[in-house]
Amino acid sequence: MIVLKWLFFTISPCDAAEPWQLGFQDAATPIMQGIIDLHHDIFFFLILILVFVLWILVRALWHFHYKKNAIPQRIVHGTTIEILWTIFPSIILMFIAIPSFALLYSMDEVVVDPAITIKAIGHQWYWTYEYSDYNSSDEQSLTFDSYMIPEEDLELGQLRLLEVDNRVVVPAKTHLRIIVTSADVLHSWAVPSLGVKCDAVPGRLNQISILVQREGVYYGQCSEICGTNHAFMPIVVEAVSRKDYGSWVSNQLIPQTGEA
């Protein structure tokens, strides 16, 4: 078992932040892929705007230097240029905004009939997960707490401050619904590779839909300052095949059924 765990941690693909990383993590959901594509498209326009503004600035500094123009020109009003610098930025903003609308609405889209519903409950300073679709008894669902693994207990291949004792296991290529809430203060359930960041508010249920397109391990953290140990609330989502997911659920339900 130890050998298998070591092989899993060293061979399985992991999506987590890397030192000196400037770009996005690899996308694992359609939403995250859309965010990356939108970023690249907008960045192209931003480069054009930057070059244009720098050209105007350098040209003004070069041609209107005080040594070349000892007596400055006094221009107090220019209707044409005022119209131009109002219309053109508006058009540019429209070209930037319109492509983002489809992505924005798709992020709020709720799957009518998800295959699995998982409830994530934030605590100071750990997460509780409930798989309400699988009942081990008439009153109890598949529930477990997820704590960060201390640095001294990490195994080979595990990531510092990002590993947990119980991962959120989900099937890949399956529509999921995540219901996020909090038991005490504000938290935020965020996993960058999945394109997910949902606030956990006490007394409120926030809902997000996820479709993980590939198997792997995805790391996130609480993204809302929630107290002293805010930085020690990692989130680990493990996407597996449907067959492996079914085996995991069965193994999780057996001990809970025995306790009941």
UniProtKB/Swiss-Prot annotation:
Cofactors that this protein relies on: Cu cation
CDD domains in the record: CcO_II_C (cd13912)
Cofactor comment text: Binds a dinuclear copper A center per subunit.
Binding site for Cu cation A2: 222, 224, 226, 230
Pfam families: COX2, COX2_TM
GO molecular function, one term: cytochrome-c oxidase activity
Top enzyme class: translocase
Gene3D superfamilies named among the record's database cross-references: 1.10.287.90, Cupredoxins - blue copper proteins
UniProt entry keywords in alphabetical sequence: Copper, Electron transport, Magnesium, Membrane, Metal-binding, Mitochondrion, Mitochondrion inner membrane, Respiratory chain, Translocase, Transmembrane, Transmembrane helix, Transport
EC number: 7.1.1.9
NCBIfam families listed in its UniProt record: CoxB
Subunit structure: Component of the cytochrome c oxidase (complex IV, CIV), a multisubunit enzyme composed of a catalytic core of 3 subunits and several supernumerary subunits. The complex exists as a monomer or a dimer and forms supercomplexes (SCs) in the inner mitochondrial membrane with ubiquinol-cytochrome c oxidoreductase (cytochrome b-c1 complex, complex III, CIII).
Known role: Component of the cytochrome c oxidase, the last enzyme in the mitochondrial electron transport chain which drives oxidative phosphorylation. The respiratory chain contains 3 multisubunit complexes succinate dehydrogenase (complex II, CII), ubiquinol-cytochrome c oxidoreductase (cytochrome b-c1 complex, complex III, CIII) and cytochrome c oxidase (complex IV, CIV), that cooperate to transfer electrons derived from NADH and succinate to molecular oxygen, creating an electrochemical gradient over the inner membrane that drives transmembrane transport and the ATP synthase.
UniProt family annotation: Belongs to the cytochrome c oxidase subunit 2 family.
Protein name: Cytochrome c oxidase subunit 2
Native species: Arabidopsis thaliana
